[in-house]
From Swiss-Prot:
The organism of origin for this protein: Naja philippinensis (Philippine cobra)
Compartments (UniProt record): Secreted
GO molecular function: acetylcholine receptor inhibitor activity; ion channel regulator activity; toxin activity
Intrachain S-S bonds: 3-23, 17-40, 42-53, 54-59
Protein name as annotated: Short neurotoxin 1
Keywords: Acetylcholine receptor inhibiting toxin, Disulfide bond, Ion channel impairing toxin, Neurotoxin, Postsynaptic neurotoxin, Secreted, Toxin
């Protein structure tokens, strides 16, 4: 599985996630604006953090 792993609005980068079946994108707002984090897996998130998990290559941009 190949997942995006760039932060927020940086140029897209990807990494190969061996053994993973999900990519994730999570985002939240703070004083800097909207922060976006991407990576492998499907983490648990705190209340107020939005999460999208998906199961195809590069689906989490």
């Amino acid at each position: 599985l190949e997942c995006h792993n760039q932060q927020s609005s940086q140029a897209p980068t990807t990494k190969t996630c061996s053994g993973e079946t999900n990519c994730y994108k999570k985002w939240w707002s703070d004083h800097r604006g909207t922060i976006i984090e991407r990576g492998c897996g499907c983490p648990k998130v705190k209340p107020g953090v939005k999460l999208n998990c998906c199961r195809t290559d590069r689906c989490n941009n």
